[in-house]
């Protein structure tokens, strides 16, 4: 179908939800959904509204509306989520805040970009995300997916494969060109020695890598020291400043 109208709302996840308990994070998301609906579609508050849940983390997806978080990435360390069904956690929070929303589908963000584009261009083969994190997916022949007999039984049909390629080089180190700045930055992340490829190219980390390079150049005398007086603390320089 065609989307006739689209309304966007943005919400900043509080630090307490990034490091707190599952209820802190998913209750915040549920409250944000409720706020958006109240402001933009109050007439739908009494209806049973279907919701698609894009979740850009490694998931063991058991069904279209069921997926277990394998491991947090991108600075998240919220407790009691890894190994649990993220759809069930969000659905419980939606019930707690009393918003009549039913999660009908769970989707990785790369798969979402690929499938959405496929509606208008059937030649598309790859979906890529380079934002806070980094990942890619592609269409594969179902018969080649031997890991899941139910999928491989579909023969020549195609199915999207979420690569989770941001984790490339985490097991076999140094296939990628890692610098001392990358190593120093990786050492202070919650998922040390994981998501190595993602940490080289994505917005969550580029600002910190740039900050370390700038500080080092100032220490060598290549830049005036007063230029870096406000950059001595990790994560003080965000990636968005690099585009100014």
Residue spans of the language-model regions?
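Short loop/turn motifs enriched for small/polar and acidic residues
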Residues: 54-58
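Glycine-rich phosphate-binding loop and adjoining helix at the ATP-binding site
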Residues: 5-30, 34, 59-118, 123-126, ...
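ATP-binding/phosphotransfer module of carbohydrate and carboxylate kinases, centering on a glycine-rich
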Residues: 1-52, 95, 119-120, 178-244
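Short beta-strand-to-turn element immediately C-terminal to the catalytic PLP-Schiff-base lysine
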Residues: 137-141
